[in-house]
Amino acid sequence: MSATPAIFWPHSEHWSVKIPLQTPHYRMPVMKDKGFVIMKTLDISNIPSSEWENLTYMDWKSGGDTNFAPLASCDGTIECKGFWENGKTDKDAKFTPNADLAPNLMKYIRSIPANFGRVRIIKLEPQTHDQAIRSVHRDDNNRLNPEDEGWVVRMWIELTDNPDSYMLLYDSDENNLPIKESEARVPMPKGAHFVVDSQRLWHVGVHNGNKPRYAVIISTESSPELNEWIIGKM
C-alpha cells in the first residue's frame, strides 16, 4: 500500500526566507496587528467584464497557473518584471496602454491616495489548497526602497465572483518561515477588497472554481494618509 504524499511546506531554503522583514521603513498602524485588513466590499456591478477580459496579458507565473495584464509598470510598457531590474523601487509607476481599456477600474484606482508601483490584473486558473500551497511565498516589495520612505504593501480587488475561493495567509516567525497556527483565509467574492503586507505574510490564492479568477493587484506605498483611507474603508 503506497504512502500518502506529504503536503508541501516551505523550509529554510525557500527563496522567500531571504527577503528582509525587519527594516526602519514607515509601516501603517492599521496593518500592525494581523498584517492584512479586509475592507468593505466594493460594488463593481457597473464595470463590464471587458475591462479585464479584453486586455493584453503576459504569461507570467506567480502563485499558480497565472497570466497578468499590467495596468501600470516601471516604464509604461506591458511588462511584469520587478522594478529593481531597472534600478527602481516598486513605486512611481507609469500607466500602460491597458489602462486606457479599463476606464472604470482606473477611476477607482486613481482615487486611492498612494504612490503606485505595479498595478496588474491577475488571471488565475483553478487550483486546490494542496496545489496552491506549493506556490505560497512572500513578495520582495521593498527591494531598493529607501529606508526613510514608506513600506510597500499590496491591495486586491476581486473582479469575478468566487465565494468558495480565498487568499491563504500565514505570518512569519523569527526565521522568516510561515507559522501554521497563524493561518487566515480571506474570501474572494466579487468586489472583495483587502490589503496585505505581502512581504511580511506568506500568501497564495486558493481558487475552488471551474473558470479563471480575475483580480486587480495594486502595489502602494504606506503613508499616514493611506492608513486613514484604509480605516475609512473598513
Role assignments for model-derived ranges:
Residues 113-194:
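Catalytic core of non-heme Fe(II) oxygenases with the double-stranded beta-helix
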